[in-house]
Structures are given as structure tokens and as C-alpha cells.
């Protein structure tokens, strides 16, 4: 096991691992136990009662966090014609067609966080799917990143404003950033409520037994704070 430093151990000592905290208590404790010099990210980790081996039980959806994540999101748009300039005018960091595809393919250009595409571009974008897919950058209708040209501006604004993708890993756990340590408790709470509501709404019909089995809140490099999953699901903004 990796050895932890004194600051981490001091933070860990403030967390009672034998109890489940209310969301309000947990968020306060996450802020208190953050010890990084930079403004750390607050993350929620949810273990779900799903079987990721079955495609129909995997979670892939989006949620618009009311206060965003506190992170500057770099957006790349695959489009052509007038849609390219429209995307740039709406705030996209990069927009183009064959030029961007070639740059990604030849230069391994990945200086962006989210890729959006119009449907007519997917035939070309598919050629670099082997590079975009493993990085979680492949446009997908389930994540709301394949949209008609008329919806580009709205989608770009939503992504820039705090819309995040929710997607379980291969063990059935969600890892979602819900803000920064510098956020107020109210901002973090409202973002957390939005996340929980989205996860509940995305419950697969094939999921058996308890759906949300455990919830943990943490900050960058900080200790995990266990949360009562029932209280987390009942929390209101």
C-alpha cells in the first residue's frame, strides 16, 4: 500500500469510518479535510447495484449541475459549412471538419475535454474512433454530444456551463465531479442533489435489488467521507 503523508493522515483522523454521514455533514467535512494548496475538486463516488456486463444496465446520461464544476471546459466541434462559424460564435474552442480530424489522427491532438458532432460528420469522425473512444471523447447520442447544427449553440453553452456526463466504470461505480472546495456548502449541496436526481432517473429496468448501494464524497487527494445512501437520495435542494 502507498504511504500517506502527515497532512492526509491528519485529515483522515477527522473522518469516522464507522458511521454514515448525512450529505450536509459529509460536504462540510470534505471541505474541512481538503489540504491541497490549490482549489481541489469535490467528487461523488456512487457504487450501483448494476451488472456492467449487461449493456442494458450501464448508466450513460448527463446532468446539468446548477453551479457547474468550477472547471473551464474545452469544447471541440466536428461540423461543416456555416455550422463551423456558428459553433465558434457560441463559444467552442475548436470547430472544423477534415482539418480537425486529420490533426487528431496525425498529431494526436487532444487539447479538449468534450467533443460534439453534427450527425452528418459521424461517418468521418468514426475513422478516429479508435483514438477518441478510449479517452472518452467520442461523440455519442446518449451523452448528448451528437446534435443537429441548429442545436449546436445550446449544447455548447450547456457543456460550458456545467453539463457533465454520468457514466459507470467497469465495476459499476460512478465518479462525478460536483464542484470545487471553494464552492459554498449550498452550491455543493445543490449540485449533489442534481446528480442524485439524474442517477435515480437513469435507473436501468434490469437492475435488481438495492440500486444506490454506497455513496462517498471526497476532495482531490483527501480522504473519502461515507454518506448515508438513503439520506443522499432523499436530499432536496
UniProtKB/Swiss-Prot annotation:
Keywords: Repressor, Ribonucleoprotein, Ribosomal protein, RNA-binding, rRNA-binding, Translation regulation, tRNA-binding
GO cellular component: large ribosomal subunit
Electron transport found in the keyword field: no
Any one Gene Ontology molecular-function term assigned to this protein's record: structural constituent of ribosome
Gene Ontology terms: biological process: regulation of translation; translation
Keyword Acetylation: no
The protein's assembly and partners: Part of the 50S ribosomal subunit.
Family: Belongs to the universal ribosomal protein uL1 family.
Role according to the record: Binds directly to 23S rRNA. The L1 stalk is quite mobile in the ribosome, and is involved in E site tRNA release.
PANTHER family (alphabetical): 54S RIBOSOMAL PROTEIN L1, MITOCHONDRIAL, LARGE RIBOSOMAL SUBUNIT PROTEIN UL1M
Name recorded for this polypeptide: Large ribosomal subunit protein uL1
Amino acid at each position: 500500500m502507498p504511504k500517506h503523508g502527515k497532512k492526509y493522515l491528519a485529515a483522515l483522523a477527522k473522518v469516522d469510518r464507522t458511521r454514515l454521514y448525512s450529505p450536509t455533514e459529509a460536504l462540510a467535512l470534505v471541505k474541512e479535510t481538503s489540504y491541497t494548496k490549490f482549489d481541489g475538486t469535490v467528487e461523488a463516488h456512487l457504487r450501483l447495484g448494476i451488472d456492467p456486463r449487461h449493456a442494458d444496465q450501464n448508466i450513460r446520461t448527463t446532468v446539468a449541475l446548477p453551479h457547474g464544476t468550477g472547471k473551464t471546459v474545452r469544447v471541440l466541434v466536428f461540423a461543416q459549412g456555416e455550422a463551423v462559424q456558428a459553433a465558434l460564435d457560441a463559444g467552442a474552442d475548436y470547430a472544423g471538419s477534415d482539418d480537425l480530424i486529420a490533426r487528431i489522427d496525425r498529431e494526436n491532438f487532444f487539447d479538449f475535454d468534450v467533443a460534439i458532432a453534427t450527425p452528418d460528420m459521424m461517418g468521418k469522425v468514426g475513422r478516429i474512433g479508435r483514438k477518441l473512444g478510449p479517452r472518452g471523447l467520442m461523440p455519442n447520442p446518449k451523452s448528448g454530444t451528437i446534435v443537429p447544427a441548429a442545436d449546436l449553440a445550446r449544447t455548447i453553452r450547456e457543456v460550458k456551463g456545467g453539463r457533465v456526463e454520468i457514466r459507470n466504470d467497469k465495476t459499476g461505480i460512478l465518479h462525478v465531479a460536483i464542484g470545487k472546495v471553494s464552492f459554498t456548502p449550498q452550491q455543493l449541496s445543490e449540485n449533489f442533489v442534481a446528480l442524485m436526481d439524474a442517477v435515480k432517473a437513469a435507473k436501468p429496468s434490469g437492475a435488481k435489488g438495492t440500486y444506490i448501494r454506497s455513496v462517498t464524497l471526497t476532495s482531490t487527494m483527501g480522504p473519502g467521507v461515507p454518506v448515508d445512501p438513503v439520506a443522499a437520495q432523499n436530499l432536496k435542494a
